[in-house]
Regions:
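ABC ATP-binding cassette signature C-motif
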Residues: 1-173
């Protein structure tokens, strides 16, 4: 119940829970319900809306620049400025290391190279829980709420998770 209160899923019968509006919470529940046609890797790759938007905008601006021939125009330079701003923001959000971070996290939790490309809905509940845990970890929330996270992990994955969480700089419950 405490985890659900902190996550904002339940409301307290008495008192209040205060947290900054910008506070990101990652909550791993025991009842994972994922039925995605995406591969495990794609599921995680699309889990950060800000990066997905930035990646899309970078592609759009790059495509527009490739098609233009007015290299000396103000509009062309404005697009270059926008591209620079988008690249800067993408870099600040670790966009250039995002896919590597996903693969490293999934492998740390026991997924093989082949399984990264396997559709998520073909996995058992325990493996879906690992994918959901990986999604939380790669998105680096301010607060991580874990409800029995090691239930479906083997010893190697538990050890990897312990090492990861020891380095985590946010709040962990």
């Amino acid at each position: 119940t405490l985890l659900r209160l902190v996550a904002g899923i339940n409301t307290p019968s008495e008192g209040k829970i205060h947290k900054p509006k910008s506070c990101k919470i990652g909550f791993l529940t025991q009842d994972i319900k994922i039925d995605s046609q995406l591969s495990v890797f794609e599921y995680l790759n699309q889990s950060n809306p800000e990066l997905t938007h930035l990646r899309s905008e970078l592609d759009r601006v790059n495509n527009e620049l490739v098609q233009r021939e007015d290299y000396e125009s103000r509009a062309y330079f404005d697009l270059l400025d926008l591209l620079n701003d988008l690249n800067h923001s993408f870099n600040l959000h670790d966009g250039y290391s995002w896919e590597e971070k996903i693969a490293t996290t999934l492998k740390g939790l026991g997924f093989s190279d082949e399984e990264l490309n396997q559709r998520l809905n073909t996995f058992s509940g325990g493996w879906k829980m690992r994918a959901e845990l990986a999604k939380i970890l790669v998105n680096q929330p301010d607060i991580i709420l874990l409800d029995e996270p090691t239930n479906h992990l083997d010893i190697i994955s538990i050890s990897w998770l312990e090492n990861y969480l020891q380095k985590f700089e946010g709040c962990l419950l």
